[in-house]
From Swiss-Prot:
It comes from the Eukaryota. There is a cross-link at K168, K329 (Glycyl lysine isopeptide (Lys-Gly) (interchain with G-Cter in ubiquitin)). This is TNF receptor-associated factor 3. Homotrimer. Heterotrimer with TRAF2 and TRAF5. Interacts with LTBR/TNFRSF3, TNFRSF4, TNFRSF5/CD40, TNFRSF8/CD30, TNFRSF13C TNFRSF17/BCMA, TLR4 and EDAR. Interacts with MAP3K5, MAP3K14, TRAIP/TRIP, TDP2/TTRAP, TANK/ITRAF and TRAF3IP1. Interaction with TNFRSF5/CD40 is modulated by TANK/ITRAF, which competes for the same binding site. Interacts with TICAM1. Interacts with TRAFD1. Interacts with OTUB1, OTUB2 and OTUD5. Interacts with RNF216, OPTN and TBK1. Identified in a complex with TRAF2, MAP3K14 and BIRC3. Interacts with BIRC2 and BIRC3. It comes from Homo sapiens (Human). Cytoplasmic E3 ubiquitin ligase that regulates various signaling pathways, such as the NF-kappa-B, mitogen-activated protein kinase (MAPK) and interferon regulatory factor (IRF) pathways, and thus controls a lot of biological processes in both immune and non-immune cell types. In TLR and RLR signaling pathways, acts as an E3 ubiquitin ligase promoting the synthesis of 'Lys-63'-linked polyubiquitin chains on several substrates such as ASC that lead to the activation of the type I interferon response or the inflammasome. Changing Y441A: Abolishes interaction with RNF216. It is linked to Immunodeficiency 132A: An autosomal dominant immunologic disorder characterized by increased susceptibility to infection with certain pathogens, including Herpes simplex virus and Mycobacterium abscessus. Immunologic work-up shows impaired production of cytokines, including INFB and IL6. Immunodeficiency 132B: An autosomal dominant immune disorder characterized by childhood onset of recurrent upper and lower respiratory infections, B-cell lymphoid hyperplasia, and dysregulation of T-cell subsets and function. Additional variable features include autoimmunity, autoinflammation, and hyper- or hypogammaglobulinemia. InterPro entries: MATH/TRAF_dom, TNF_rcpt-assoc_TRAF_met, TRAF-like, TRAF1-6_MATH_dom, TRAF3/5_RING, TRAF3_MATH, TRAF3_RING-HC, Znf_RING. There is a cross-link at C56, C124 (Glycyl cysteine thioester (Cys-Gly) (interchain with G-Cter in ubiquitin)). The modification Phosphoserine is found at S9.
Length: 568
């Protein structure tokens, strides 16, 4: 960028920026405002630095002053404030938007600076205040380019030349036709005389005896000109004769036999076309009949689809009733759990009583041995403590059983999809390595409320071929309440998946179709069948070095395809 002093020198050539009209409210005078940055006008005297923007280094336009005392153009300040942490380009102080204000005093001083007219290069020698530039260009400058006042003319001329252009040089000025005396734009005068003027003298194009006539009379003359070419009235039937009106009459009188033959040929051709149309009509009728048959077939299919829709609606209603029934069961379970909660509270109370009794026993044991009655009381208290301990044990067992049942109900799914969350991966993996707990079973899941009962089984340290190197994942069919109503062997497609907990979601998965001859997919005779799946599902190095483990937790997903599964 050139320095501001070079740009402000009186002899420097400058390119003025695009301008928009803006009203100075403080002075009531219209002034020019650049679209961006400060003024690039040619000033008569070198402009002081205090009148220049600290960002664009041009003469300030609508100056704004910051808290640190530096000035910026309004558009430059807006650009600075659009950043996340605006700073003054002069002193690097932070700029606070609410503490930036308009510097109207500086603005008035700048608008009073003397400049050369923008049209100096065209010959204008005017020197004026910057604030008067717009009025000068709009009303007074003889060297300002203005558009021609005629709407169709696109030329621009200097204000001093505008009158001569409009009256003498504009191609769209009015001109008078020398033949018809009508007013025509100068640019269209020649075309008017050559093709349109009705008063221009023309000759007959057929070289008849009439040599001169007006263009307005030509149309009527051509309709009766003896030399005008014409065609035989039997042209549509194949006659190609052409000539003057007199020749046409003589031809028609002498060629009657030829014309009759042409009529015969035309009639024969017409009969052939009628025959073809009849054949086409027969084919069309066949097509129409075929389309009618298709429509009937479609109507039958639509009725069948409607019946299927009604059946599906009844199934949906049945499922809704089942869901309502399950909701009622959950409510009943909640009611059953409430007494156990009360028992738990009673157990807490009993524990407090036991602690109190133990304290009393301790006190009694420290009393003099001669107190025989105390010994008997101690025995009685010990028996009471024993009964309380038994009751607490029973309550603990019943609460644990209810908690297990409730957890199974909470985590069970009935859409053929299992998402199994395995916490404490490192501890469980170490237990598998040490041989304490080789495998883990997931909670059961189902293909429907009355469908197959299934679960997943995982070996964190691998099994068989994958032992010590891989995670082994298997699918297990369990004995369900509704197995008697389901088709066997189990045939649904199974997808096993290890879920990626990172943002890329690059899950690892494998899918298989059950082998109908395998005992793993027969109807269970025990609690569950033999597991079937992938001994080398994923290498432990891949599992433990990726984003498959977060917060010492992994997620395993099993999907059973239920799309073709019939209702029981």
């Amino acid at each position: 960028m050139e320095s501001s002093k070079k740009m402000d020198s009186p002899g420097a050539l400058q390119t003025n920026p695009p301008l928009k009209l803006h009203t100075d409210r403080s002075a009531g005078t219209p002034v020019f405002v650049p679209e961006q940055g400060g003024y690039k006008e040619k000033f008569v005297k070198t402009v002081e630095d205090k009148y220049k923007c600290e960002k664009c280094h041009l003469v300030l336009c609508s100056p704004k002053q910051t808290e640190c005392g530096h000035r910026f153009c309004e558009s430059c300040m807006a650009a600075l404030l659009s950043s996340s942490s605006p700073k003054c380009t002069a002193c690097q102080e932070s700029i606070v938007k609410d503490k930036v204000f308009k510097d109207n005093c500086c603005k008035r001083e700048i608008l009073a600076l003397q400049i050369y007219c923008r049209n100096e290069s065209r010959g204008c020698a005017e020197q004026l205040m910057l604030g008067h530039l717009l009025v000068h260009l709009k009303n007074d400058c003889h060297f300002e380019e203005l558009p021609c006042v005629r709407p169709d003319c696109k030329e621009k001329v200097l204000r001093k030349d505008l009158r001569d252009h409009v009256e003498k040089a504009c191609k769209y000025r009015e001109a008078t036709c020398s033949h018809c005396k009508s007013q025509v734009p100068m640019i269209a005068l020649q075309k008017h005389e050559d093709t349109d003027c009705p008063c221009v003298v023309v000759s007959c194009p057929h070289k008849c005896s009439v040599q001169t006539l007006l263009r307005s009379e030509l149309s009527a003359h051509l309709s009766e000109c003896v030399n005008a070419p014409s065609t035989c009235s039997f042209k549509r039937y194949g006659c190609v004769f052409q000539g003057t009106n007199q020749q046409i009459k003589a031809h028609e009188a002498s060629s009657a036999v030829q014309h009759v033959n042409l009529l015969k040929e035309w009639s024969n051709s017409l009969e052939k076309k009628v025959s073809l149309l009849q054949n086409e009509s027969v084919e069309k009728n066949k097509s129409i009949q075929s389309l009618h048959n298709q429509i009937c077939s479609f109507e039958i299919e639509i009725e069948r689809q409607k019946e299927m829709l009604r059946n599906n609606e009844s199934k949906i209603l049945h499922l809704q009733r089942v869901i309502d029934s399950q909701a009622e069961k959950l409510k009943e379970l909640d009611k059953e759990i409430r007494p156990f909660r009360q028992n738990w509270e009673e157990a807490d109370s009993m524990k407090s009583s036991v602690e109190s009794l133990q304290n009393r026993v301790t006190e009694l044991e420290s009393v003099d041995k001669s107190a025989g009655q105390v010994a008997r009381n101690t025995g009685l208290l010990e028996s009471q403590l024993s009964r309380h301990d038994q009751m607490l044990s029973v309550h603990d067992i019943r609460l644990a059983d209810m908690d297990l049942r409730f957890q199974v109900l909470e985590t069970a799914s009935y859409n053929g999809v299992l998402i199994w969350k395995i916490r404490d991966y490192k501890r469980r993996k170490q237990e598998a390595v040490m041989g304490k707990t080789l495998s883990l079973y997931s909670q059961p899941f189902y293909t429907g409320y009355f469908g197959y009962k299934m679960c997943a089984r995982v070996y964190l340290n691998g099994d068989g071929m994958g032992k010590g190197t891989h995670l082994s994942l298997f699918f297990v069919i369990m004995r369900g309440e509704y197995d008697a109503l389901l088709p066997w062997p189990f045939k649904q497609k199974v997808t096993l998946m290890l879920m990626d907990q990172g943002s890329s979601r690059r899950h690892l998965g494998d899918a298989f179709k059950p082998d109908p001859n395998s005992s793993s997919f027969k109807k269970p005779t025990g609690e569950m069948n033999i597991a079937s799946g992938c001994p080398v599902f994923v290498a432990q190095t891949v599992l433990e070095n990726g984003t498959y483990i977060k917060d010492d937790t992994i997620f395993i997903k099993v999907i059973v395809d239920t799309s073709d599964l019939p209702d029981p």
